């Protein structure tokens, strides 16, 4: 069972939810070693390479995603169906994330101790 599961399901830059979620995730990693991160639905866009949010006066927080390794956040997953529905592939992502089927994502969510959704 994962003690903390962070579920990213909203698109980036339309609101501060994604950035705040990444901030919370990195902060929590100092206190908790058992963290799972899942990107599903429009949340997969947060992992997309080549974003230029400065055009809409938004902060680019994609470099913060690359800190996951440094913070020992190793359980990072992306829903393969969400990628396919949006015409994306894992090569389009800014970080390596293990692809899971929707059914496998549901299993991970059922195993979550605490779930934080952004």
Swiss-Prot record:
Predominant localisation class: cytoplasm
GO cellular component: cytoplasm
Superkingdom: Bacteria
Localization of this protein: Cytoplasm
Keyword Cytoplasm: yes
Keywords, alphabetical: Cytoplasm
SUPFAM superfamilies reported for this sequence: DsrEFH-like
Family assignment from sequence similarity: Belongs to the DsrF/TusC family.
Protein function: Could be part of a sulfur-relay system.
Full protein name: Protein TusC homolog
Organism of provenance: Vibrio parahaemolyticus serotype O3:K6 (strain RIMD 2210633)
């Amino acid at each position: 069972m994962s003690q903390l599961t962070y579920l990213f399901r909203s698109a980036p830059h339309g609101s501060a939810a994604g950035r705040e979620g990444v901030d919370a995730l990195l902060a929590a990693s100092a206190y908790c070693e058992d963290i799972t991160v899942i990107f599903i639905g429009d949340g997969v866009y947060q992992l997309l390479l080549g974003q230029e949010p400065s055009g809409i006066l938004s902060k680019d927080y994609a470099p913060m995603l690359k800190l996951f390794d440094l913070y020992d956040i190793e359980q990072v997953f992306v829903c393969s169906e969400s990628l396919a529905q949006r015409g994306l592939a894992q090569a389009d992502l800014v970080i390596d994330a293990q692809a899971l089927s929707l059914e496998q994502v549901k299993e991970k969510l059922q195993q979550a101790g605490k779930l934080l959704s952004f």
